[in-house]
């Protein structure tokens, strides 16, 4: 029987000093025998997805204490990728994932907490906490802040749904008036919550449902809706039960590594492919699998992406469907239900809320559920009132979207495409693979051949696109923006947004060893591995080279001979210390980012640390 970890600092005469300090935090005599539950909150006033979380940790804490536990809350950092986008701030986004993972580990282990509630929401916070949970392997449950309501703007007598990406695209469109841009800016992000499309934050929160580490509805229940409060309260009660099952009944099935098994990771990427999730999820799932000790690789993602269909298209893949619409169609449990009926799901994996995922689907998938409370739960609608207050409205749709032929969620027979929403491409320019979000690519350009227009940084690429250097038929190549080369693997949302604003969204491709925002659509291929700074062939591309992209056959190729590539590689190596570095790029890289670059690995392994460099 495992002993409560907290007994290390709460039991025995020699711990009188530690108990004195615990008492100073408010603990009393009867508390020292209870499980100590850490609450990792990520409240910050910098990020709309986190601005409403300030009091929610204590909401969870009260439920923990009512259920017989002791709750101790702490905070970790959160970076807003949208605000950090397009300038040096984006260098810090991906590295913050590792800092978040470390900070949670530090706090939980330093204070010997028994279990963990992760209150996350946005792009790097959920992945960072997920990595920490799998590293710590103590009972853990995730509850996110929830998605933002979609924006709506009235323009020329039309009500137009929109989101953050629309603001970026329209701002760079010379045909849009200042008045229209201002109206969109003021309407694009109306409430607290993670941005309203199937961007990285919402994708990751949905994937925690598939991994079995969060409650049904975690990924899709709006931040503003009263129903989300139920998830926070249930998480507080549930974590005490999980802790007691492990420490008092020796039930190891409640541990994160038992739940997030290889089969669960297969379910997560199947969901990702089916819902056309952000390409960043690939990076984060690979990193999480590494922490879990699960041998889940790009080859597994490639394998799954070839036979799982695209069952759901959400902004940015389509302009008028947002996460609130997915919720109305039954949320993530209903997408998983369709995968299950297609024979594409591992049903027998445990979750934090049910004995098996299959059992959970029987209750929560609206196509097979019988509980009126479940139907009512998925009728939760946007309130339509700008606010930064959580749980501030209780509006309901009149009816659910249960149309699996033409609705937001489709069944396999009526899939948007039998090819999934994500694909891994391989070739001489990306020998270890690269990722494209096919759900956001018009099928007319799934096969594309163009001339390379090469840039050594995102900033130069933006200047080239807005300066009209890039023309229809070009393949924009942005290199030395990988985890090591950036450093920090910047997102390329501005380049793709500016291509759209120039009307080139279906006329050009973009290839990078950096990554893309979940808000990106178009023929945008990222995570090219190995990256340029680690000797990848993307560093050898020259202006005017022909690049061939073939999504159906999962192929990408630089149309030069092996001999020519070898010649270019030899010429690069001959540069000595200047080899595999960007030419004429001026960029201030802080000591913190240099330390990150020294240990990070390429995108095909999740950009995790190479700890062999520090192990003795």
Curated annotation (Swiss-Prot):
Pathway: Amino-acid biosynthesis; L-isoleucine biosynthesis; L-isoleucine from 2-oxobutanoate: step 3/4; Amino-acid biosynthesis; L-valine biosynthesis; L-valine from pyruvate: step 3/4. GO terms for cellular component: cytosol. The active site is at 517 (proton acceptor). Belongs to the IlvD/Edd family. It catalyses: (2R)-2,3-dihydroxy-3-methylbutanoate = 3-methyl-2-oxobutanoate + H2O; (2R,3R)-2,3-dihydroxy-3-methylpentanoate = (S)-3-methyl-2-oxopentanoate + H2O. PROSITE patterns: ILVD_EDD_1 (PS00886), ILVD_EDD_2 (PS00887). One of its GO terms (biological process) is isoleucine biosynthetic process. Mg(2+) binds at residues 81, 123-124, 491. Functions in the biosynthesis of branched-chain amino acids. Catalyzes the dehydration of (2R,3R)-2,3-dihydroxy-3-methylpentanoate (2,3-dihydroxy-3-methylvalerate) into 2-oxo-3-methylpentanoate (2-oxo-3-methylvalerate) and of (2R)-2,3-dihydroxy-3-methylbutanoate (2,3-dihydroxyisovalerate) into 2-oxo-3-methylbutanoate (2-oxoisovalerate), the penultimate precursor to L-isoleucine and L-valine, respectively. Transmembrane segments: none annotated. It comes from the Bacteria. InterPro entries: Dihydro-acid_dehy_C, DihydroxyA_deHydtase, DiOHA_6PGluconate_deHydtase_CS, ILV_EDD_C, ILV_EDD_N, IlvD/EDD_N. Its cofactor is [2Fe-2S] cluster; Mg(2+). Binds 1 [2Fe-2S] cluster per subunit. This cluster acts as a Lewis acid cofactor. The modification N6-carboxylysine is found at residue 124. Homodimer. Its EC number is 4.2.1.9. [2Fe-2S] cluster binds at residues 122, 195. This is Dihydroxy-acid dehydratase. Pfam families: ILV_EDD_C (PF24877), ILVD_EDD_N (PF00920). One of its GO terms (molecular function) is magnesium ion binding. Keywords: 2Fe-2S, Amino-acid biosynthesis, Branched-chain amino acid biosynthesis, Iron, Iron-sulfur, Lyase, Magnesium, Metal-binding. The gene is ilvD.
